[in-house]
């Protein structure tokens, strides 16, 4: 009986810690990570760049990625 109560208390403590960790804040998104739904979640040394996906001139999607500050990417032809 004591073992069952102890096991229940341990499981309750683990679940509480997991929930508290989730509420306290998520980890930042690393370099080249997709941040379309959370543009403000890039790590502090990164910025987010967003791109529009066009099909026949009509926007069909938008994607954002965390990238390095002061770095410019150009399309290679």
Curated annotation (Swiss-Prot):
Task: Name the cystine pairs.
Answer: none
Respond yes or no to whether keyword Ligase is given for this record. no
- Please list every transmembrane segment annotated in the UniProt record, as residue ranges: none
Q: Name one GO molecular function term.
A: toxin activity
Which keywords belong to this entry? Disulfide bond, Secreted, Signal, Toxin
Alphabetical list of Pfam families matching this protein = Toxin_35
Q: Where in the cell is it found?
A: Secreted
**Which parts of this protein are propeptide?**
21-26
Q: Which positions carry the signal peptide feature in this UniProt record?
A: 1-20
The keyword Disulfide bond is assigned to this record: yes
Enumerate the InterPro entries for this protein: Spider_toxin_CSTX_knottin
Family statement:
Belongs to the neurotoxin 19 (CSTX) family. 10 (U11-Lctx) subfamily.
Q: What is this protein called?
A: U11-lycotoxin-Ls1c
Q: Which organism is it from?
A: Lycosa singoriensis
- Specify the taxonomic lineage: Eukaryota, Metazoa, Ecdysozoa, Arthropoda, Chelicerata
């Amino acid at each position: 009986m004591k073992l069952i109560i102890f096991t229940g208390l341990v499981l309750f403590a683990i679940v509480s810690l997991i929930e508290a960790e989730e509420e306290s804040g998520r980890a930042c998104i690393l370099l080249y990570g997709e941040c379309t739904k959370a543009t403000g979640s890039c790590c502090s040394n990164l910025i987010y760049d967003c791109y529009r996906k066009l099909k026949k001139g009509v926007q069909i999607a938008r994607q954002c990625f965390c990238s390095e500050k002061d770095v410019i990417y150009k399309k290679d032809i």
